[in-house]
Amino acid sequence: MSRVRDAGCVAAGIVIGAGAWYCVYKYTRGRDQTKKRMAKPKNRAVAGTGARARAGLRAGFTIDLGSGFSPPTPVRAEAEDRAQDEASALDTVGAEAVAPAASSAEAQSGAGSQAQEADGAGVGPKAESVVGAAMASAIAPPPGVTEALGAAEAPAMAGAPKVAEAPREAETSRAAVPPGTVVPTEAAAPTEVTEGPGVAAPTKVAEAPGVASPTEAAEAPVPATPTGAAAPTGAAESPGTSGSPRTAVVPGTSAAKKATPGAHTGAIPKATSATGAVPKGGGKGVTRSRNGGKGKGKKSKVEVDELGMGFRPGDGAAAAAAASANGGQAFLAEVPDSEEGESGWTDTESDSDSEPETQRRGRGRRPVAMQKRPFPYEIDEILGVRDLRKVLALLQKSDDPFIQQVALLTLSNNANYSCNQETIRKLGGLPIIANMINKTDPHIKEKALMAMNNLSENYENQGRLQVYMNKVMDDIMASNLNSAVQVVGLKFLTNMTITNDYQHLLVNSIANFFRLLSQGGGKIKVEILKILSNFAENPDMLKKLLSTQVPASFSSLYNSYVESEILINALTLFEIIYDNLRAEVFNYREFNKGSLFYLCTTSGVCVKKIRALANHHDLLVKVKVIKLVNKF
């Protein structure tokens, strides 16, 4: 029996010595390699488990002592069971299990051998985490090294943020522990380690072994050193965001420690926004962010007005024009309640002038607030009775210049149709539109005159609009020469003087017409000549027209260089007056020299200039001239 015992002791000594030598070799070789290159993470398929590593060591150093003897069975300590249970629990929580590094395998093999030695020396079952005296003296790294033996290496995932704190085994004291002493152990809650001031951030901290855990990780029982022995916890911090510098707390420095919530009770600490995001695929039960999305955090803000003008960039040109017209504020129409759920205020929104209902944000979709258009209709849109009523109500209630202009344009375009001319009158829209000419804004006045001009094509509407003729004439004379208000106002008066019913209202304005005729541009001349032609066809207005003193420049309308349109209307006026002079006998004594009567007689200046137009290049003018010359 003594020989058998001696052989067993020899075998155990050989195994222990070989394991210690192998650990020293790997440790020193690993330190040399860390200075040269970064360690690459190993996946689960490449890296072997602790049991496989121990099996490899046993297979390499087994001594055949005969058929009656078998290699000594390693003693598995209770702490090792707990550590493996926790490692398996972390594997089930994480989406990708962390592969133990080569150093983990070596540490576990060394721990297995230490367990055998502890069995013979009388060390307790929790002695696995404490390195023996011989190994501690042989393997004594400096206290500033952050590599902790027995911890797994965190997987390096490109672009994925890492958890800053992970429960792992704390480094035991580097002091030599006398053999045969039982080291008391106690479970300590993981602490949140913060960097102390002046601590350098090593670039090789990613190589420091550490188990990367999900946001909520279970506590790991950490063996503690006896009282009086310094046991710094080498906690490595992983960056919370990609591209951040990696920092580590070096043991031996004065680093401030904050107790994690629940540390005094042993509760599982929950990661907050300060600890960084969970690595992609870090847990089977995916941790959701605060705003409900998966993975990356999503913005919860609705897009704001980037330009400060009351609309977003995607609202279209109409909104931009609306805001610019009112000093940088967008106009939203106040719409009356529609009857019987009628659409027209929100359902006419085009895709080009509005934001889409939802926008793509990562993997989720969030609603985007819809913004109403400044005006509910297109200005060239043909509306029905109910929509016309809404536009009239909007025009009457709104004090916004932009809304008033767009509403007047919409009504003006709809008034081109005879059916809508009657509809607007029946809806009481004539006074609403006509009152807009009292506005001081020339743009609003112009749009109102355009609508009145189109509405005046209806004879019944003329009876309602004739009360505004003198007001329009006053605005024409007060406006700038050749302005849009003058042109549109003269067009309205042209329609109102087609019949003889309301011409007498402008009898006192004939002299003003001749003044504008001599000073105005081409459009002004054309409209005034049409009005004077209407007066000339009315016998009651003819005498007043002929007795009016006209400027000497009136005869210049019949020169050959005058525009064809002006020339044709001037020839038409002369033809109407000449025909009335031939049909009716007038007393020359009733008219003063310089009046229109003397210019239009056979011996007048106009007749001589008209004869000179017989060879005019314009065919219509030439035909008109030939017709008049035959009457002379």
Curated annotation (Swiss-Prot):
Region (Disordered): 68-124, 160-304, 335-369
Protein role: May regulate the dynamics and distribution of mitochondria in neural cells.
Pfam families xref list: Arm_2
InterPro entries for the chain: ARM-like, ARM-rpt_dom, ARM-type_fold, Armadillo, Armcx_regulator
Principal location listed in the UniProt entry: mitochondrion
Name of the molecule in the record: Armadillo repeat-containing X-linked protein 2
Family: Belongs to the eutherian X-chromosome-specific Armcx family.
Cellular component per GO, a single term: mitochondrial outer membrane
Organism: Homo sapiens
